[in-house]
Amino acid sequence: MVPPSISVPYVGMEEPAFFVGRKSLSKHKKGEKRKMAKDKKLVKAITSRDEDFAQWYTDVVSEAELMDYSSVKGCMNYLPNGYAIWEMIQADLDRRFKETDVENVSLPLLIPESLLQKEADHIDGFAPEVAWVTHGGMERLQERLCIRPTSETLFCDLWARTVQSYRDLPKVWNQWNSVLRWEKTTRPFLRSREFLWQEGHTIHATHEEAEERTIQMWQVYKDFYEETMAMPFVAGRKAEHEKFAGAEDTYTVEALMHDGKALQAATSHFFGSGFPDAFDIKYVDKNNELQSVHETSWGLSTRSIGGLIMVHGDDDGLVLPPRVAPVECRIIPIAQHKEGVLDRSYELLAELKKAGYRVKIDASEKSPGWKFSEQEILGIPTRIEIGPKDIENNQVVVVRRDNREKIVVSLDDIATQLRVILETIQSDMYNKAKAFLDSHIYEATTLEEMVEKFKSDRGLIKACWCGDEACEDEVKYATGGAATRCLIEDEEMISDKCIYCGKPAKHMVYWGKSY
């Protein structure tokens, strides 16, 4: 039974509807609950996902101890459980980047105002979200310094001073850092003022090379989400007015959350020569002629963790795909006070670690039921139950987190069979999420049909559009928030008329409400 909600005002974050009525996140109260449950089952203060999706999300983030609120409005503290997931994401992506010859760098946090103003479209796009440093100690600065919302201007300033010849190209760089954007409405992981991310920036000798890199990094993100996060998606180019500030083209990866809303999960941008020309980045080619460079940028942030939670989580907490789980398996001794149980459990721990598994043991004095519940909240993909009878029969019981299936495995085979089980979980989780996505994509050829579909169903709708932003605004108003997510360019259009105005359609697009 879910305990009643308590409405607790909190000054550390904005309080949109997403947070109103959330349960207390007090460590003291949470500790009391768990102390009371020591000899019973761990009390999970998690609202049902279907009852209140926003509250469910907040509860999971809290109960799994992924983050805590900061005393700075709109910012958050990444706790060990949450940061460990980010470290797994970092390690996987960093490997993928380096396989494409990306090099890591680190550029400053602060950007002079004059530098930010060199590219008008770029600064116009970020102006409402910029935070400024105006004083150094007690002295007012002669020029304001922007706390980076993104780093295109810093990279371009550096390259303008260091790139001279075609021999200096390409530059294919990435940095892992945090950025600050003064968001008005904040949600843990999904939208906070300061967040962690990676931002890749490249310059190339030719338009074709830069376009190729843009598409290549877009593909890296798609592979990452499919193979590591077990998250299916739709993907395509953004509409003209949805492109990143200053970009000629933006390619997006859009995942569908369990509540039917889309999440922009990663983007790759092609800038062409316009942005670097504003910074006078030129190089001398093989014919000794001065040429412009062509730029790209691409990024993925900690909102990927929010997407992971909302795609795979259930009413008992997190459900982590094995390839991104910081811990793949937790060993839980049963009747551990009995002779030999703990010794054999620790032997198994050592064996699995030696075999390369990310594995831990819970040998605390809490009851097995409490330990099972905690493992479920944390989303650890498997647990191994081992008790006196198991040892006597030379076996263990492996329990899958995703579907609760119990599998009896010989102790002689556990080091090999556990890998098979984990890979099966990874595959099953992707297939389940893909089936959900596929079953929540609809088609509409009239505005009335689209409005009714959004009233009765959750998901994405394919519909045709003339490309006019005013028409999109009218659709957004009529549907209560649905907007273009990306263009569909690899399928035949389902209509030759715009869903709103009836004029000739230029694009078929995915429409959806979003985070």
Description of each model-found segment:
Residues 8-11, 20, 29:
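Short hydrophobic alpha-helical segments enriched in small aliphatic residues
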Residues 14:
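Short polybasic linear motifs
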Residues 24:
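Glycine- and charge-rich intrinsically disordered segments
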Residues 3-4:
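Short, often N-terminal, low-complexity regions
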Residues 27-515:
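NTP/phosphate- and nucleic-acid-binding module
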